[in-house]
Amino acid sequence: MVSNHARNEIEDHLGHVPSWIDSLAEPASDHSWGLVRDLEFGETELTAREKALIGVGVAAAIKCPYCTDFHKAEARMEDVTDEELAEAVNLASNTQYFSTVLHGSEVDIEEFTAETAEIVEYIENQRAAPAGAD
């Protein structure tokens, strides 16, 4: 159970203390709230909009209805469109698909990493080249 101090913070941030807060186990309950407070609601390198889109994609990938509901509501508060939500979910799906293929095929990680570096270098060079310079 979270401390009284954390309960007061939660109420200040969310308007009330949601029932799921009592599911947080000791001794990490206050810390768990701190993660939500600092990562979800705090000022970080990512905007609230970016966090919401990432959250929707991850929630879909891990098939969590709780997370999906929360992050979609969060995204709506940031004026994320249906099209952007669909794209975030499709990107997460794409990552999950290729992860399954790569793991199931036991692709060599060192070879994959080297090939990825080559691909990135090629794309960066293409982007840096003046238009029409082939």
Q: Which residue ranges define each predicted feature?
A:
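Hydrophobic alpha-helical segments
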Residues: 1-134
